[in-house]
Amino acid sequence: MTEAFARAKINLTLHVTGQRPDGYHLLDSLVVFADVGDRVRTEPAEALSLAITGPQAVNLPVSDDNLVLRAARAMGGQGARITLEKHLPVASGIGGGSADAAATLKALAELWQRPLPEAAAVLRLGADVPVCLEGRAVRMAGVGEILEPLAGPLPPAWLVLANPGVSVPTPPVFKALARRDNPPMPERLPDWGSADELAAFLAAMRNDLEAPAIALAPEVAETRAALAAEPGCLIARMSGSGATCFGLFAEERPARAAAEALRAAHPGWWIEPARMAG
C-alpha cells in the first residue's frame, strides 16, 4: 500500500493578467500550502477502482470524471484500489480536487514504480495540479504551468481556513470578471522576515476573483469579515475562486482561538486552523 497527503492549496494573491485566445486565463499568484488536507491510499488490484470516505465524502460522488481516476488513467491505467479520504470541502477554492489528483500521481508512481507523467499531461488534468504536485510555496504564472520558487523561505505563520458551506463553480466567477488585463505582482517579490511583513505585502496585492465571487455568493464577504474580526488576524482574503477564505495569523494560539470562536458562532461552516507550509 502507498499513501500521499493532499494538502490544501492557498492563493495568498491571485491576479488575473490576461486571457489566451483559447479562453484560458493568465494568472500571477503567490501560492502556499496548509497542513490540512485529504489522504489518498492505493493498493494493488486487477482493476482500477475508487472509494471515497471521510467527512466530505457525501459531497463528492464517485464518477469516471473524478480527478483521482483521471490522474490514475494519466499514469497508464493499470489496476489499483484507490481510497480517497476526503476532508477538504468540494469546489471551495483551495485546490482539493487538484491536490487529490497530485497525491494520486505520487501514490501510484510509488505503487507501480513508474515515473510521473510529463508536464503537459499533468497540466491537462487541471491548472492547479502542477502546483499541487510541486507541493511548496511558489509564484504561479501563465495558466498554472509556470512555477517560480521564492527567493527565501516564508516566515512562520498560521492560517485559519473558513468555508460557509456554499460551492462557487469556477467558470461563472471568471465570466463575471470586470477586467481580464489586471496588473501583475511586482517583478521581484520581497523577502518577508515576519508574518506582519507578509501581511503588509498582501494588503497591497489582490485576489481579482474575490469581487465576482462575492457577487455570486455574498456569503464569501461574510466569511472574510468574520475572519478579519478575530483577534490576531493580520489579513483575511478569499482563496482561489472561493468560497473558502483564509485569515493569516502570526502564531498558533490566536489562530486556534479564532477557529474555536468561529465554530461556535457559525456551526454550519467548515473551519480549520493550520500551519502555513512553504
UniProtKB/Swiss-Prot annotation:
EC numbers, comma separated: 2.7.1.148
Protein known as: 4-diphosphocytidyl-2-C-methyl-D-erythritol kinase
Pfam families: GHMP_kinases_C, GHMP_kinases_N
Pathway participation: Isoprenoid biosynthesis; isopentenyl diphosphate biosynthesis via DXP pathway; isopentenyl diphosphate from 1-deoxy-D-xylulose 5-phosphate: step 3/6
Family of this protein: Belongs to the GHMP kinase family. IspE subfamily.
Gene: ispE
SUPFAM superfamilies in the cross-refs: GHMP Kinase, C-terminal domain, Ribosomal protein S5 domain 2-like
Protein residues bound to ATP: 89-99
Record: active site: 9, 128
Keywords: ATP-binding, Isoprene biosynthesis, Kinase, Nucleotide-binding, Transferase
Main enzyme class: transferase
Listed HAMAP family: IspE
Origin: domain of life: Bacteria
Any one GO molecular-function label of the UniProt entry: 4-(cytidine 5'-diphospho)-2-C-methyl-D-erythritol kinase activity
Organism listed in the record: Cereibacter sphaeroides (strain ATCC 17025 / ATH 2.4.3)
